[in-house]
Amino acid sequence: MFSYKPPSKCQPEGSKVGQWTICQIPLKDGNNIELSRYAKLLPHRVLQQYEVSIWLDSNLIIRDTILYEQLIKKIGEGYKWYGIKHPILDCIYDDARKCLLTAKARYKDVKPQIYFLKTEGYPHHFGLFENNFIVRRHNDHIIKKIDENWWQLFSTYSKRDQLSLFYLFWKHGFSPKLIFPNGESTHNSRFLKFIPHKQLSIKKKIKNKLIEYQNRLMLKILD
């Protein structure tokens, strides 16, 4: 089990924290968001010696060993990518709107990305994953292409990785598989414990309200 972090004297490369081995992120000039996404979007660059990787967001805890057994079985089936279906949405365009209405992204960052998707002819309701739990054969050539393109779009447009993944599945003609059956997500699975993010400070809440207000004024692009 590996945890990727920026360079730190307190947790040097190769040190252990419980079952986790600390590995430094090989990205020199990234901000906190980019550092956190590097290993997630580009596992083939940091785990070349392994055939399969499992990405788990820091707000998820596996609480039943049966899940490990199920994952081993799924990996043995030979599929290249497993994810978890979004519990509510099935469309990048709808998720973009939600990001704007909840101040998770700014209109100026989302607008060019949506314009790009529309000019590409990307369809509505093509699908959506949560992206907080991913199992993939990251060294497979098609998965490498998807992940490299994923990082490129993430770096070019908004820092919301959900707004580009299913476009890449569509672009590459790739069909991922589900970790859980339809209707089961990280929020209701008995195998996982979902930990809500920390409460925002008053200053951050005010800032987000201003961003939300600005976004609402500019939402015509998504209509």
State the predicted function of each range:
Residues 1-223:
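Glycosyltransferase catalytic domains, chiefly GT-A lineage
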